[in-house]
Design a protein with these regions (language model features):
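N-terminal subdomain of lithium-sensitive/metallo-dependent phosphomonoesterases centered on the IMPase/IPPase/PAP
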Residues: 1-88
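Residues within alpha-helical transmembrane segments of multi-pass membrane proteins, especially transporters
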Residues: 21, 104-106
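Short loop/turn microsegments at loop-to-beta-strand junctions
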Residues: 79-83, 103, 114
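Conserved structural elements of the adenylate-forming
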Residues: 98-102
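Acidic beta-strand-loop-alpha-helix segment within the catalytic core
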Residues: 106-162
Length: 162
């Protein structure tokens, strides 16, 4: 049986290190090294290097797990445990030096999500949870609203443009 609390603690550290790498690379980012995956999707050397670092650390943490990663590390897997990794979620924002962009890491067992960590780099916000635990933002427990009437609800969304 996996110790999800311990795994989550490690994944939080991995996400923070990846975020520090993104922050450092953003200051000297070379836009000429950006590739187009398609008309509205980009990839940079920063995406690829961030993924390489994250995957290496996750392999050490849970060697038996497979990977599905945004930039192609690993492949679709039949393994029970599988890491889902987006090493730079918001590449277009990153390229244009706009917030937000983040590091997203999850662990699943078959179809069940076990761990989720999202680090929003620009705001220094670390969201995390694991199966059976509450959700947290920077170590403060957070909750969804109990408002069920949409007329009384406050809903916020950010447009994702290319």
């Amino acid at each position: 049986m996996l110790d999800l609390e311990k795994i989550t603690l490690n994944v939080r550290e991995i996400a923070l290190r990846a975020g520090a790498f993104l922050r450092n690379e953003r200051s000297g980012f070379d836009r000429s090294k950006v590739e187009k995956k398609n008309a509205h999707d980009y990839v940079s050397y920063v995406d690829k290097e961030s993924e390489r670092r994250i995957v290496a650390q996750l392999r050490e943490l849970l060697p038996e797990a497979g990977f599905i990663a945004e930039e192609g590390s690993g492949s679709l897997t039949t393994e029970n445990y599988c890491w889902l990794v987006d090493p730079l979620d918001g590449t277009t924002n990153f390229i244009h030096n706009n917030a937000p962009y983040c590091v997203s890491i999850a662990l699943r067992n078959k179809e069940e999500l076990l761990v989720g960590v999202v680090y929003e780099v620009c705001r220094d916000e670390l969201y995390w949870t694991y199966k059976g635990a509450p959700s947290y933002l920077n170590n403060k427990e957070i909750h969804v609203s109990d408002v069920s009437d949409m007329d009384e609800a406050f809903v916020r969304s950010e447009e994702h443009t290319s």
